Regions:
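Histone-fold recognition with a strong bias for associated Lys/Arg-rich disordered tails
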Residues: 1-192
Length: 192
């Protein structure tokens, strides 16, 4: 199973965030910080739950401290972050997805207990259960919306296939179409 481009961007963003904080590793807290700033669905779900990116970053600095900003690139993922990525793969498999998307990272984060990211979420007042429920609800809504749009698209294609655009044909139409009142009036006059 491969990572979606958005997921790869989030992992790279987490590495940049770790480096800016002076940490020589990428942990689950860095992944959470990247997800809170994600402009798409995951960031939206977190913001709806009241997770503020700036406040979360400030709490991460208080809890884990700032390292040395001029360190070389982060040395890799912590075991916690590795488990989070494996959990995201399991979530993608459960949902029969071909790619690991940021939403799957969020679901894995909700299931992961005792992680640094989980601690930051708890401080924000978000439990794993709330996060999981909100994410699943959003994914269900998104799936239903996409299915509805697809059905409407099929209907429109059928309508276009089996109908004619009368406005486009207006120049070739007879001048009597749509003029029932006038025709009835003329017939009434002629019949007198």
């Amino acid at each position: 199973m491969r990572y979606h481009t958005q997921t790869v961007e989030q992992i790279q963003s987490a590495a940049r965030k770790a480096r800016s904080l002076g940490h020589s590793y990428v942990g689950s807290a860095h992944l959470l910080l990247a997800l809170t700033r994600e402009p798409g669905n995951v960031g939206l779900v977190l913001r709806q739950l009241g997770v503020d990116p700036e406040l979360t970053e400030a709490m991460a600095l208080l809890l884990y401290g700032a390292g040395t900003p001029d360190l070389p690139l982060p040395q890799g993922l912590t075991e916690e972050a590795r488990q989070l990525l494996l959990g995201a793969a399991r979530e993608a498999k459960r949902q029969k997805s071909r790619e690991i998307r940021p939403e799957h990272l969020l679901l894995a984060l909700a299931r992961q207990e005792g992680s640094a990211a989980g601690e930051l979420l708890q401080i924000n007042g978000v439990t794993g259960d709330i996060l999981f429920t909100q994410t699943v609800d959003y994914l269900r809504w998104e799936r239903q919306t996409l299915a509805k749009e697809k059905r409407e698209e099929v209907r429109l294609r059928l309508l276009e296939q089996f109908s004619e655009d009368l406005v486009a044909r207006a120049s070739t139409m007879e001048p009597v179409i749509g003029r029932e009142k006038e025709i009835d009036m003329v017939i009434g006059i002629l019949c007198r």
